[in-house]
Amino acid sequence: MANTPKTLIAFVFSVIVIISYVHCHTTIASAPSSGEPTTYATGPALSKHSHDNDGICFVTPACFAPGQYEIGCIVYCHESHYKHYKCVNRSCCCYNTDKNASELK
């Protein structure tokens, strides 16, 4: 098989697209571990967003620069069956748990 310029350009373009897709869709939030401070989300910062204020907060790099990397907080809260999320200071707060989480899986 001859390596024509069209084949090489198509291959390089494909590699660039795959790398950029993977790079743009990574998350940096990790699940809270026993070493990280975890608190219950009952503070006044969340009261205007939730009536129940049932949830957890944990420190994560996803909320160090709010607006840029909040996708990690969103993904973690969604996969943990919380309805809402919010970055409060440097913490990701997930709250208002889905009552029928067992039915979602």
Curated annotation (Swiss-Prot):
Disulphide bonds in the chain: 57-94, 63-87, 73-92, 77-93
Signal peptide: 1-24
Localisation per UniProt entry: Secreted
A GO CC term attached to the entry: extracellular region
Major location (coarse): secreted
GO annotation terms (biological process): defense response to fungus; killing of cells of another organism
Keyword tags: Antimicrobial, Disulfide bond, Fungicide, Plant defense, Secreted, Signal
Family: Belongs to the DEFL family.
Protein name: Defensin-like protein 106
Source species: Arabidopsis thaliana (Mouse-ear cress)
